[in-house]
Amino acid sequence: SQIEELKGAAARRDGIVVSRIAHKWQPIFAMLKISDMLPVLSRLEEEGAHKWTDELSRNLDELLVCAEKIRTGLKLVLAKEE
């Protein structure tokens, strides 16, 4: 029916808008995640976990993912401003 088609179109449009907003804020969310993880890494180091335990390795992997998101997001922002 026409009503269902309109609802579907609205949902797709809303999904695109949410996706754009999430993409725009991705670098900030990644920075917040990094700031949340730093105390954990510091505690692990104090506890002698600097021997590359699984937990520390996982946290470092997450930091690298977040850093890549920040880099990608900032490149997009700079490209739009040029």
Feature-to-residue mapping (PLM):
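C-terminal helical "lid" subdomain and adjoining coupling/linker elements of P-loop NTPases
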Residues: 33-36
